Amino acid sequence: MPTVALRYRFRQPLDAPAEAAFAWCTDFGPSDGPLFAQRTERSVRRLADGALVLTDITYPNGRRRRIRRLVRIDPARRSWTNTHLDGPFRHSQFWYRIVPNGPRRSRLEFVGLALESVPRRLSGAQVATLAAERGRADSGAWRRYLAPALARDLAAPSPRGSPRPLRARRLARGRP
């Protein structure tokens, strides 16, 4: 089966200061499952400072699927990469960056390179159409699930006025 490279990008406004948004987005852990549209179980293995492997178990159509991702976090640039090690998008890579947009707001800048197997060779126009569809789906997930969850989570009051650990603040933040 041929493989196509789907290149796409989008920006998503966030109702949070850049540092808080970055910390929230890169605080990966086992409680992330409710973020996703389908049932997901997550484990995190920290390899080194700023490098980790996420292992997600999903159940599309009732069948178990394991997806591992290598994540590299760069706090100085408020960015991270997510490279699929296996699963349906093996070797696909996604780049995220949080950019300040004033003192209380920020935006996510996303660049994706999704490598997908297709049943036959596609024309340039067909590849462009698939890339646009993928971009709409990913940006829609951020718009509908993650951005609102981030805003809700960071707005939630801390118990007894103490700073909450990010993991507790995230509750069950939305999807991608």
Residue ranges with predicted function:
Residues 1-49, 176:
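Hydrophobic ligand-binding cavity/cleft-lining segments
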Residues 7-8, 38-40, 52-55, 79-81, ...:
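Short structured motifs
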Residues 15-19, 89, 137:
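A generic structural signal for alpha-helix starts
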Residues 20-25, 70-71, 108-110, 142:
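Hydrophobic pocket/interface hotspot
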Residues 27-31, 74, 145, 149:
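Conserved short hydrophobic interaction patches
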Residues 34, 59-109, 113-117, 171-176:
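Hydrophobic-ligand binding "helix-grip"
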Residues 46-62:
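Short, well-structured hydrophobic secondary-structure segments
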Residues 113-176:
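A conserved amphipathic terminal alpha-helix motif
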